[in-house]
């Protein structure tokens, strides 16, 4: 019987597939958790709306039956705006726009995503193209298709299977890469080095210079000991 509307803070779960007749909206300050429970939210019947799911608050989309159930909104865009946050493990099949200092920290996106206006991707799996611009940041997540960076977008972390493309240089400050990034994309004070990860053999790290020697192999608290190959290492925290 649920066909759309405003969702107040709370923990919701689907008991059957839903086809929306109007938008779903989560207002600023609301904390909404939805478990798809192996069911789908469809939007084929929604007309007259550019965005059919609008998140202005904190939205967690989970699915305890990942073999079934998706956000099935192929023809309409999922909007995250105005300091909103998206978490979860659900599969989303709509294009997504992320604006206004919002954050994507989970879910699997099967369509393209555009991230702008000081927003950030910190996690999630991205199976189609990703576009970042207007001071947007990628600091985490797994990207299986091309990532395009415009104007002031920045990459500080994440795992990238395909090539990065950009009209501007000096924007990569971290991350793991299957394909070696173009040297012109690496920010000043950073370098491409071997990652030790066979799936993502290249990583970008900050350089450290001391007494005229440049160090390009950071060690953090995850290092607990072992054999060290030839190289210049520096500590980023106590070990």
Give short role names for the model-derived ranges.
Residues 29, 57, 84, 102, ...:
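Periodic glycine anchor positions in long extracellular repeat architectures
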Residues 86-92, 124, 219-221, 226-239:
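Intrinsically disordered, low-complexity linker/propeptide segments enriched in Ser/Thr/Gly/Pro
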Residues 38-48, 62-74, 83-94, 105-111, ...:
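Beta-strand-rich solenoid/repeat architectures in extracellular/passenger domains
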Residues 53-54, 77-79, 95-99, 113-116, ...:
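Low-complexity, polar/charged sequence tracts that form flexible coils or short amphipathic helices
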Residues 19-33, 42-62, 72-82, 95-98, ...:
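Extracellular beta-strand-rich solenoid/capping regions of secreted or surface-exposed proteins
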Residues 10, 17, 29-31, 37, ...:
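Tight coil/turn sites that cap or link beta-strands
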Residues 10-32, 36-45, 90, 143, ...:
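N-terminal extracellular ligand-recognition/capping segment immediately after the signal peptide
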Residues 1-7, 140-141, 157-158, 162-165, ...:
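Extracellular/surface-exposed low-complexity segments
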């Amino acid at each position: 019987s649920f066909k759309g509307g405003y969702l107040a803070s709370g923990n919701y779960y689907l008991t059957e597939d839903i086809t929306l007749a109007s938008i779903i909206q989560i207002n600023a300050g609301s904390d909404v958790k939805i478990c798809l429970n192996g069911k789908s939210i469809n939007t084929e019947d929604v007309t007259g709306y550019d965005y059919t799911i609008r998140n202005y608050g904190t939205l967690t989309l989970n699915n305890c039956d990942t073999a079934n159930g998706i956000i099935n909104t192929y023809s309409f865009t999922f909007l995250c705006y105005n300091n909103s946050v998206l978490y979860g493990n659900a599969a989303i099949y709509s294009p997504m726009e992320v604006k206004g200092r919002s954050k994507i920290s989970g879910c699997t996106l099967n369509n393209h995503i555009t991230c702008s206006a000081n927003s950030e991707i910190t996690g999630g799996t991205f199976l189609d193209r990703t576009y970042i611009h207007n001071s947007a940041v990628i600091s985490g997540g797994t990207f299986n298709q091309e990532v395009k960076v415009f104007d002031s977008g920045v990459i500080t972390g994440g795992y990238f299977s395909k090539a990065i493309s950009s009209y501007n240089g000096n924007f990569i400050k971290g991350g793991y890469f299957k394909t070696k990034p173009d040297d012109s994309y690496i920010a000043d004070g950073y370098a491409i080095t071997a990652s030790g990860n066979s799936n993502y053999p290249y990583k970008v790290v900050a350089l450290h210079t001391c007494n005229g020697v440049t160090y390009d192999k950071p060690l953090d608290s995850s290092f607990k000991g072992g054999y060290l190959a030839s190289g210049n290492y520096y500590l980023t925290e106590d070990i």
